[in-house]
Design a protein with these regions (language model features):
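N-terminal secretory signal peptides
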Residues: 1-14, 18-30, 35
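Early extracytoplasmic/lumenal segment of secretory-pathway proteins
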Residues: 39-114
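Short helices/loops that flank or line small-molecule/ion binding pockets
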Residues: 89-102, 114-119, 251-261, 265
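A bilobed periplasmic-binding-protein/Venus flytrap-type ligand-binding module shared by bacterial periplasmic
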Residues: 166-173, 214-216, 299-312, 331-332
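Extracytoplasmic/periplasmic substrate-binding proteins
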Residues: 242-308, 349-358
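Mature extracytoplasmic/periplasmic domains
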Residues: 302-370
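Conserved C-terminal helix/tail region of periplasmic/extracytoplasmic solute-binding proteins
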Residues: 366-403
Length: 403
């Protein structure tokens, strides 16, 4: 590993110093193309359109904008758009059918990653562009490297979160905190409509809850939602009788939790920390693990749709390489949105902007370290299985109650 970049002392929007030394030790120096397979950089500056379907810009936008300032000869500006993950496959399909892809890079969770691979909408990055990412797997944290494997040859992991599932609750309303799925069901029966979670196809906490239940319930095959999740599907259908509706995203869940219209929800490390740091959920709200839980890890990825012009691919690949340098990775601590955030080894909280350090210290939970060491970890479902799990949930669990 390279010598760590000195700690940040400035506001997170201060322009990043694109230190060639730190970049070179981890990846190729920004701007260098090491193979004829990698397209040449553009002769004049281009505009790059970035779509975020994961909330990842909270973690990476500062670094992306700093890249533009340092490389105005290649990129004149970045346009940023946010949309729900389930809407993007149809949008890309229409663009690609018309022969005009106006989206140059997507920042995504495992949801669109899975759908994009399944529907053949993504550019294969490896092995053609491997020269831009030397030692890629070795530079990831071990658990993050496992999540990179899910991307196959189509995505580059940029941020990592151990995730959950955990239960977040209002301690003034929930005094008998459930520690098993059975206890959660009993609580929901006694307190109908006070528990809520969002549609898994567009919610990190929702899909982590979905993918964590097979381990908690002792299902036949936690990696096979079609043939191995009999207990999970039966449980979710029964639980659904006491859930008023399923929001289409996690933001609505946290708003209702904070306003007091719900008392408990499944969560993950980042969605516990960040809404409290932002004042959406009271700081006093608590989280609890399930007994004998398995952590289902999560990640965000950078992908390139099919149909992007070669000169734009060159810029996006160079940006991706930069976003994996320790200096840029330190920004991903943010205010805990994807806690901790960095996917790359050796990126400590002391290297993050002061605001990030303050938020994590004030709103983080010391018990996380204990739980992360106490319980085993696994990865999110592989892309094809994840698509199947979302389809079954939509049809059998959420069909009448998602809005």
């Amino acid at each position: 590993m390279p010598k760590p970049t000195p700690p940040f002392n400035n506001h997170r929007r201060h322009t990043l110093r694109l230190a060639a030394g730190s970049a070179a030790a981890l990846l190729l120096p920004v701007g260098r193309t090491a193979s004829a397979q990698v397209p040449p950089m553009p002769k004049s500056a281009v505009t790059i359109n970035v779509v975020d379907v994961a909330g990842n810009l909270a973690l990476t936008q500062d670094a992306i904008e700093a890249y533009q300032k340092a490389h105005a000869q290649w990129v004149s500006k970045f346009n940023f758009t946010k949309m729900p993950a389930p809407e993007l496959p149809g949008k890309l399909k229409a663009m690609q059918a018309a022969g005009r892809t106006d989206i140059d890079m997507v920042l995504t969770g495992t949801d669109f990653l899975a759908a994009g691979i399944e529907q053949g909408e993504l550019t294969q990055l490896m092995p053609a562009f491997a020269s831009k990412f030397p030692n890629l797997m070795a530079n990831y944290q071990p658990a993050a490297a496992k999540m990179q494997e899910l991307a196959g040859d189509y995505g580059i992991e940029v941020t990592f979160m151990p995730a959950g599932p955990l239960l977040e609750y209002n301690p003034d309303k929930v005094t008998d905190v459930p520690t098993t799925p059975q206890e959660l069901l009993a609580w929901c029966k006694a307190h109908p409509n006070r528990f809520i979670y969002a549609r898994p196809a567009n919610s990190g906490p929702g899909r982590t809850f979905l993918m964590g239940l097979p381990y908690l319930l002792g299902d036949k095959d936690p990696k096979d939602p079609v043939h191995g999740w009999d207990k999970t599907w039966a449980y979710l259908k029964e639980l659904g009788a006491y859930v008023e509706y399923y929001p289409t995203g996690t933001g609505a869940v946290m708003k209702e939790l904070g306003e007091g219209s719900r008392d408990m929800t499944p969560t993950v490390t980042g969605w516990d920390l960040n809404p409290r740091a932002l004042g959406i959920v009271p700081k006093s709200f608590k989280v609890a693990p399930f007994q004998h839980m398995t952590w289902v890890n999560d990640a965000h990825y950078m992908v390139i749709p099919k149909g992007v012009a070669p000169e734009k691919i060159a810029v996006v690949l160079d940006l991706m390489a930069y976003l994996l340098t320790p200096h840029a990775q330190a920004y991903t601590y943010d205010q805990g949105y994807f806690y901790p955030g960095p996917a790359v080894k050796g990126v400590t909280l002391a290297m993050a902007p002061a605001k990030s350090q303050e938020s994590v210290k004030e709103y983080g939970r010391p018990e996380y370290d204990k739980w992360l060491g106490e319980f085993p970890h696994t990865q999110s479902l592989p892309p094809k299985s994840q698509v199947e799990a979302f389809r079954i949930w939509d049809q059998q669990v959420g069909a009448q109650k998602t809005k």
